[in-house]
């Protein structure tokens, strides 16, 4: 079984959350959705793989750029865990949006998580998150 993390983490908070979740997964390969030089349509995930997809929630939705790039990846029925990372305010419909995109791309969603990270603009909100709490 191969393990992947598909990330969009412009300020690093989402990446920290994803690392905490996948720290015991063997040989995780990272696909960075913020890369401007990557052909995301070239990714074909093996069907027996486990994939973590993590994105921030900005204004209750996932960034459209991240959704558009994620939609290009062929999930090939790989099992997928979704993570919406938010700054202790709200994550709105981010997980629903991610699930719709994952299903359309051929992933099999098995779990969804909302996780708190330090707010990217107002750092007093969820300061220091994620942490052991």
Give names to the regions the model predicted.
Residues 1-36, 40-133:
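FMN-binding flavodoxin-like domain, especially the glycine-rich phosphate-binding loop
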């Amino acid at each position: 079984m191969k393990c992947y993390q598909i990330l969009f983490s412009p300020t690093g908070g989402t990446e920290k959350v994803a690392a905490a979740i996948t720290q015991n997964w063997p040989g995780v390969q990272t696909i960075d959705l913020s890369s401007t030089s990557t052909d995301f349509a070239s990714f074909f995930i093996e069907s027996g793989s486990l994939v973590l997809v993590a994105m921030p929630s900005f204004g209750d939705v996932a960034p459209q750029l991240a959704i558009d790039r994620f939609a290009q990846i062929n999930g090939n029925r790989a099992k997928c865990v979704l993570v919406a990372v938010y700054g202790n305010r709200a994550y709105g419909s981010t997980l629903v949006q991610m699930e719709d995109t994952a299903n359309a791309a051929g992933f099999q969603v098995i779990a969804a998580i909302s996780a708190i990270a330090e707010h990217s603009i107002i750092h007093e909100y969820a300061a220091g998150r994620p942490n052991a709490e």
